[in-house]
Amino acid sequence: MSDGETLADVRIVLIGDEGCGKTSLVMSLLEDEWVDAVPRRLDRVLIPADVTPENVTTSIVDLSIKEEEDNWLISEMRQANVICVVYSVTDDTTVERIQEKWLPLIRQAFGEYHETPIILVGNKSDGTANNTDKLPSGQSLVSSLQILPIMEANTEVETCVECSARTMKNVSEIFYYAQKAVIYPTRPLYDADTKQLTDRAKKALIRVFKICDRDNDGYLSDTELNDFQKLCFGIPLTSTALEDVKRAVADGCPDGVASDALMLAGFLYLHLLFIERGRHETTWAVLRKFGYETSLKLAEEYLYPRITIPVGCSTELSPEGVQFVSALFEKYDEDKDGCLSPSELQNLFSVCSAPVITKDNILALETNQRGWLTYNGYMAYWNMTTLINLTQTFEQLAYLGFPVGRSGPGRAGNTLDSIRVTRERKKDLENHGTDRKVFQCLVVGAKDAGKTVFMQSLAGRGMSDVAQIGRRHSPFVINRVKVKEESKYLLLREVDVLSPQDALGSGETSADVVAFLYDVSNPDSFAFCATVYQKYFYRTKTPCVMIATKVEREEVDQRWEIPPEEFCKQFELPKPIKFSSSNIGQSNSPIFEQLAMMAVYPHLRRVFYLSDSNLLSKITFGAAIVALAGFLVLKNL
């Protein structure tokens, strides 16, 4: 059951033998006094949230067995969040039927290993038998010695409460415990057999510890503990309370405290103490603050917040998102060398559900000579995923703890603040400017046109590096590029088509700029580019450029109607740019700057056509405007 359901509704089902007082218990709760005349069975009772201690709407269902079949009972029980098995402390038979009838029936409903909490309710503890024969004071016919073995043998039984509908003893407590059993269940957290935290509880709490360990030293200092306390509960701990916590941990867990700070083992032990002392709500308050549902999985709304991206818009990291991921790099770059080693990278993403940056997709990013991720490559990764896979960005930021601290105590928040939706491209064109930071360049070319070498050059990798890359690698490469002294991110995306007749997807045709690569030594290479251009990009507003590769080889005539230079002139494209050996491995190559320039200023396509390709990297934005104005004047003469 999700947290949303828990907070909205708790469904309590009462079962047990006839005459145990199930209906009387509900009537006493409703009337706040003993009711002599009770109906045979009550319909569903709804208790509003504002009259319950946990502020949850609660429904109580009284199931009678006299006239109902087991199948019907099972169907009703399956809708329950918690089941109260009522027996009479004045009748041994009703106790025996707990194991003979009721617990097996519950397992039929939920399965052999279920997590629906069960509460045993011993009614009629006021000391009457059949409402006539008085029992000795303080003595019940059913002793705890009969109930304890049942609880020990059935771990789904949360607790046992003796009560009396007649004297009102523990009546309200029963339903309070039932609510708590749903909202703060024990079984996901605690293994009754080993008397230890469950593996999934440990995993969740380890994530919490790592997020709260701001300096990544493996300890929670007093400052970090107090920040944790204020984050989860809204109030700080006094210095005395802090010392009491550390003393309690040190007494029971010798490895839990070191250098006057709480270690991971101590943090886990502290929550074990909470649970053993019946303070499950404390641990659950922490877990829910960090996004966990009752299943100890992160909530869907926490991982994947709803967002609408209008057509023509894209997504980028917001300033808050940039600050958060940048701080993570600083936190986990233990040797402060400006790179993340494999162990540092693994440590950073250890709280995520799956490996994030693998050997394959690291080829899309800038690394140092040892293959370690640089700060620039790390930031480029986040910009890439936010543009092409926003869901992945949301999920990873949630696991890394982005929303924590951005909402009130007890609330997990979401990752929406980590991103910004850019203005529609159409508006950018109309306004002759954009505030976008990330731009996508489609790389199109026939097989062996040199696309891999070209793309990997943006990440600073040369021929020897490319030679070690397998055939199956990331189709993306991203890096930071300067556009008139302003940093932008250029994302190259290879189009994997075997022939120009292959269809391109909408995501591919909506790029900011397109680079068509052709091998000057292959007579059939340019035809591929020309065909794709005419089929998908002619008469569009997407800037395009032809790039000649392997220019050191002997140039041959291309098997196309007209040469590449004439083709570009005919379709008003910039002259073909030569990608030579001097450009290989150079992330700061003017070619990448030109691609970024064309993506940032698509409204200046005419300038790109009129200007020499080398001139493009030299002109200022103002000069480009002048050139465009000059063209318009000439056109209108």
Curated annotation (Swiss-Prot):
<keyword id="KW-0496">Mitochondrion</keyword>
<feature type="binding site">
    <location>
        <begin position="28"/>
        <end position="35"/>
    </location>
    <ligand>
        <name>GTP 1</name>
    </ligand>
</feature>
<feature type="binding site">
    <location>
        <begin position="445"/>
        <end position="452"/>
    </location>
    <ligand>
        <name>GTP 2</name>
    </ligand>
</feature>
<feature type="binding site">
    <location>
        <position position="344"/>
    </location>
    <ligand>
        <name>Ca(2+) 2</name>
    </ligand>
</feature>
<dbReference type="GO" id="GO:0005741">
    <property type="term" value="C:mitochondrial outer membrane"/>
</dbReference>
<dbReference type="InterPro" id="IPR018247">
    <property type="entry name" value="EF_Hand_1_Ca_BS"/>
</dbReference>
<dbReference type="Pfam" id="PF13202">
    <property type="entry name" value="EF-hand_5"/>
</dbReference>
<dbReference type="GO" id="GO:0005509">
    <property type="term" value="F:calcium ion binding"/>
</dbReference>
<protein>
    <recommendedName>
        <fullName>Mitochondrial Rho GTPase 1</fullName>
        <ecNumber>3.6.5.-</ecNumber>
    </recommendedName>
</protein>
<dbReference type="InterPro" id="IPR027417">
    <property type="entry name" value="P-loop_NTPase"/>
</dbReference>
<dbReference type="InterPro" id="IPR001806">
    <property type="entry name" value="Small_GTPase"/>
</dbReference>
<dbReference type="InterPro" id="IPR021181">
    <property type="entry name" value="Miro"/>
</dbReference>
<feature type="domain" description="Miro 2">
    <location>
        <begin position="436"/>
        <end position="601"/>
    </location>
</feature>
<dbReference type="InterPro" id="IPR011992">
    <property type="entry name" value="EF-hand-dom_pair"/>
</dbReference>
<keyword id="KW-0342">GTP-binding</keyword>
<dbReference type="InterPro" id="IPR020860">
    <property type="entry name" value="MIRO_dom"/>
</dbReference>
<feature type="binding site">
    <location>
        <position position="337"/>
    </location>
    <ligand>
        <name>Ca(2+) 2</name>
    </ligand>
</feature>
<dbReference type="InterPro" id="IPR052266">
    <property type="entry name" value="Miro-EF-hand_domain"/>
</dbReference>
<feature type="binding site">
    <location>
        <begin position="482"/>
        <end position="486"/>
    </location>
    <ligand>
        <name>GTP 2</name>
    </ligand>
</feature>
<dbReference type="InterPro" id="IPR013567">
    <property type="entry name" value="EF_hand_assoc_2"/>
</dbReference>
<keyword id="KW-0547">Nucleotide-binding</keyword>
<keyword id="KW-0378">Hydrolase</keyword>
<comment type="function">
    <text>Mitochondrial GTPase involved in mitochondrial trafficking. Probably involved in control of anterograde transport of mitochondria and their subcellular distribution.</text>
</comment>
<dbReference type="GO" id="GO:0019725">
    <property type="term" value="P:cellular homeostasis"/>
</dbReference>
<feature type="domain" description="EF-hand 1">
    <location>
        <begin position="200"/>
        <end position="235"/>
    </location>
</feature>
<dbReference type="GO" id="GO:0007005">
    <property type="term" value="P:mitochondrion organization"/>
</dbReference>
<keyword id="KW-1000">Mitochondrion outer membrane</keyword>
<dbReference type="Pfam" id="PF08356">
    <property type="entry name" value="EF_assoc_2"/>
</dbReference>
<dbReference type="GO" id="GO:0097345">
    <property type="term" value="P:mitochondrial outer membrane permeabilization"/>
</dbReference>
<feature type="binding site">
    <location>
        <position position="219"/>
    </location>
    <ligand>
        <name>Ca(2+) 1</name>
    </ligand>
</feature>
<feature type="binding site">
    <location>
        <position position="333"/>
    </location>
    <ligand>
        <name>Ca(2+) 2</name>
    </ligand>
</feature>
<feature type="domain" description="Miro 1">
    <location>
        <begin position="7"/>
        <end position="184"/>
    </location>
</feature>
<feature type="binding site">
    <location>
        <position position="224"/>
    </location>
    <ligand>
        <name>Ca(2+) 1</name>
    </ligand>
</feature>
<keyword id="KW-0677">Repeat</keyword>
<feature type="topological domain" description="Cytoplasmic">
    <location>
        <begin position="1"/>
        <end position="613"/>
    </location>
</feature>
<feature type="binding site">
    <location>
        <position position="215"/>
    </location>
    <ligand>
        <name>Ca(2+) 1</name>
    </ligand>
</feature>
<dbReference type="GO" id="GO:0047497">
    <property type="term" value="P:mitochondrion transport along microtubule"/>
</dbReference>
<dbReference type="GO" id="GO:0003924">
    <property type="term" value="F:GTPase activity"/>
</dbReference>
<comment type="similarity">
    <text>Belongs to the mitochondrial Rho GTPase family.</text>
</comment>
<dbReference type="GO" id="GO:0005525">
    <property type="term" value="F:GTP binding"/>
</dbReference>
<keyword id="KW-0472">Membrane</keyword>
<feature type="binding site">
    <location>
        <position position="339"/>
    </location>
    <ligand>
        <name>Ca(2+) 2</name>
    </ligand>
</feature>
